[in-house]
Amino acid sequence: MEYNRLIDHTLLKADATVEQIEKLCKEALQYNFFSVCVNSAFVPLAKSFLEGSDVKVATTIGFPLGASATAVKAFEVEQALKEGADEFDMVINVGWLKSKLYRLVHEDIAEVVKAAGGKVVKVIIETCYLTDDEKKIASSIAAAAGAHYVKTSTGFGTGGATVEDVQLIRSVVGPNIGVKASGGIRDAATLKAMVDAGANRIGASASVKIMEELRIEGN
């Protein structure tokens, strides 16, 4: 399996520098990762650096809390689209979900999907804050609202992806919607476990280390 083509090579920390974003892009080119995932201020830089390559530029929407207004999330998408973003990783409004305001959660996602105009939208449900029932409901709403992927985590919450959560999300969304595992995936064994559980996209900042481990293993 071409594990590199499952990876969104990610740098979202608050103090990420221009130099670090350029390094991220260089690594993505070297390993032919599927995409880089950066905060939206760095979309133009990443797009320019990766021009002419197969590496896509993904960015975050409503990140990391998910609690910004729906119209603001939609505007973030529109702005990032103008600047060359290919994919969007949005955070749901977790508080609305836990308040059982499911219609608002659906509309929030649907407006982002609409603004993206057919580009890939990954919906982060932030599993660390949810019960299993809430994870199922969130995954169902995301699928119904037009998400292309349901994603486990921002990496900024109290926990990241687990095999159990990936399996649960996959069981809800079925085979036709993607599942992205992210948060705490720092070695090849964890990446493989997530893929075996049903993930078909991986968000990681330790992607180079993972690829070197896979190379040594002969994968």
From Swiss-Prot:
UniProt keyword Lyase, yes or no: yes
GO biological process: 2-deoxyribose 1-phosphate catabolic process; carbohydrate catabolic process; deoxyribonucleotide catabolic process
Catalytic residues of the enzyme: 89, 151, 180
InterPro entries: Aldolase_TIM, DeoC, DeoC/FbaB/LacD_aldolase, DeoC_typeI
Keywords attached to this entry: Cytoplasm, Lyase, Schiff base
Biological source species: Coprothermobacter proteolyticus (strain ATCC 35245 / DSM 5265 / OCM 4 / BT)
Subcellular location(s) per record: Cytoplasm
Protein name (Swiss-Prot/TrEMBL): Deoxyribose-phosphate aldolase
Signal peptide: none
EC number, UniProt record: 4.1.2.4
A Gene Ontology term for the protein's cellular component: cytoplasm
Catalytic activity: 2-deoxy-D-ribose 5-phosphate = D-glyceraldehyde 3-phosphate + acetaldehyde
Annotated TM spans: none
The family this protein is said to belong to: Belongs to the DeoC/FbaB aldolase family. DeoC type 1 subfamily.
PANTHER family listed in its UniProt record: DEOXYRIBOSE-PHOSPHATE ALDOLASE (PTHR10889:SF1)
Pathway linked to the protein: Carbohydrate degradation; 2-deoxy-D-ribose 1-phosphate degradation; D-glyceraldehyde 3-phosphate and acetaldehyde from 2-deoxy-alpha-D-ribose 1-phosphate: step 2/2
Top enzyme category: lyase
CDD domains reported for this sequence: DeoC (cd00959)
Role noted for this protein: Catalyzes a reversible aldol reaction between acetaldehyde and D-glyceraldehyde 3-phosphate to generate 2-deoxy-D-ribose 5-phosphate.
GO molecular function: deoxyribose-phosphate aldolase activity
